[in-house]
Amino acid sequence: MQTVRADLFRLLGDEDRLRLLALCAEEELTVGELAQLLDESQPQITKKTQPLREVGLLAARRDGTRTLLKSDLRADVVIAAAVTEGRRLCSKDGSLAKVARVVAQREELSKKLFDAPAKTEPVPALGEGLAAWLPIFAPLLPGRALAIDAGTGEGALLPLLSPLYERVIAVDRSAARLARCAARLDAWGLANVRLREGSIEDSASLAEDVMPRGGADLVVISRVLHHLGRPQDAISSATRLLRAGGHLAIVDYMPHDDEALREHGHVWLGFEPTKLEHWIVDAGLAPVVVQPLPTPHHPPLQLAIGRKPARATA
């Protein structure tokens, strides 16, 4: 929608709209998150953002029943000045400083669920249910020194990774899930797997272990990204752990509308393949493949693989 200059000046003459524009330039945020940051009701936020959406200054994206808003920062001195002023206002009222905390709250439910005691269940047979995963690893095997399973959970992929790689590091932020994973490793007899408690987004300590040896040949992030407030941060962190020529393999859901999964800690209801590819490229990887996985899983899964170039700086 074309906006004449006078209309744009009038639109940006409202301090509340300047705040909204600045906050959505900082992070893609839901209406509910904006309401929390500005201490207003969601209907008020919806009313105030609507004019910005109508002229294209805010881009809206659906995720199930939620709407996320992001500022469309075109090369325009007036809009740039508006965002700068909005940031000043948000810094003054404290809302800008709260953005990181609000985004982190997206993951609170999944953290509570994963740390909860699990029902006692028998350890599955070694290799049970892994046949469908075998095609994923075929193009990734030239380098077989080290694989990292980021967000290993209870170790579902470890019986496949352990025989293929000399060393495997399995990382998870849930101590409870790692304890259950350790019991499974003992039962399976997988001696070359080492468990580490931590988050892939904060990979500094892991890098100290991995990078002196040249980096990992493979980092797997399987059904993890939909639990994270900022999935792109995990992809960037994983990329930094790869050796030149190493691969990042992501398995996650295609877009779906099963809102009930939010009760199980799902922050996002799947991802568009183009979104995964965009994040892979932004992290400094060359896309190898982004495609649906031929499994009966519901919601349907997809695979995205990126390769770290030989002279990558990421």
Predicted regions and their residues:
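C-terminal alpha-helical "lid/dimerization" subdomain adjacent to the S-adenosyl-L-methionine
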Residues: 247-305
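Beta-hairpin "wing" of winged helix-turn-helix
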Residues: 54-63, 70
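A short glycine-rich, Lys/Arg-flanked "PGG" loop and its adjoining helix->strand segment in the class I
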Residues: 232-247
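A conserved beta-strand element that flanks and buttresses the S-adenosyl-L-methionine
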Residues: 220
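Class I SAM-dependent methyltransferase SAM/SAH-binding core
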Residues: 148, 154-207
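N-terminal helix-turn-helix DNA-binding core of bacterial DNA-binding proteins
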Residues: 3-41, 67-71
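Amphipathic alpha-helical dimerization/coiled-coil segments
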Residues: 78-124
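Conserved alpha-helix/loop element of class I SAM-dependent methyltransferases that forms part
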Residues: 126-145
